[in-house]
Amino acid sequence: MWRSSRRWLLLCLLALTSLASAQPMPGTVIDLASGQPLDESMFIQRAAGAQRLLLGERHDLAGDHAAQRWLLQALHQQRPQGALVMEMIASERQPRLQRVQRWLAKGNHADGSRLQELLDWDARWPWAAYGGLVQDAAAAGIALVGGNLSLAEVNRLLASTEPVAFPVAAARQRLSAVVLAQHADAAPMLDGMLAVQFARDRRMAQVLTDAPAPALLVAGRWHVLRGTGVPGHLPPGTPALVIVLASPGEQVDASDADLLWVLGDD
């Protein structure tokens, strides 16, 4: 049984490597500092050289989720990937994640639905969208790390009426505009919602700093921008590469990110 399990794990790892090498890079990657496109080889070399990599997604686009899987596989093929940090998992769930990962490391097997059950996956983040990325990490033995607040922490912060001081002064104004544009009736709760955003970014920065390197953080776009999110909470001098997924024609300032990864809107 042990030999059979080890053989299954080896096949998973080989499949992961083959998939990354067989699939071309989706979309186009632009270096925001120079305005020049990067080919697949240049992109992977740049990303693989970063000890802390932040990837900002649109939560509801299948193309973004496919790009995340492609990048994780390509990075792990280039060099061993230390950790995958996800906004979609609360950090309080780390003991459970570690138990499941130790169980898998012993050669046990869990398919998609079984892995979802073992992790007690948060249904607010559709497994159909993120399950593939989680399964890829599990199959490759990459440490899976939760980066978000618990629901209890969120609820407590939402009741806050004290303004928070963001690391970047303009962040409050930028995030306030986004929140009010998306939730027209949110003005009475604005301080609480910004407190949640601030605390989430601080938590993800802490987790990303402590995670085995090289570490990849997958989070919403506003969480990874230098002007509004996680980078401002990292220890001073911490090198980090910021990649933002975007649609054709979208603009992102070079002060917010290093690379713009342009995909379709699917």
Locate predicted features:
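Solvent-exposed loop/turn segments at secondary-structure junctions
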Residues: 58-61, 89-93, 150-154, 221-225, ...
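Histidine-anchored nucleotide/phosphate-binding helix
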Residues: 66-76
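C-terminal regions of proteins
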Residues: 134, 199-209, 216, 223-266
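N- or domain-start disorder-to-order transition segments that initiate the globular core
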Residues: 13-14, 21-50
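Sec-dependent N-terminal signal peptides
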Residues: 8-16
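A substrate-binding/cap region within the structured catalytic cores of diverse enzymes
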Residues: 78, 82-83, 88, 95-212
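Short hydrophobic beta-strand that contains or immediately precedes a catalytic carboxylate
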Residues: 53-56, 216-219
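Bacterial N-terminal signal peptides that target proteins for export
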Residues: 1-9
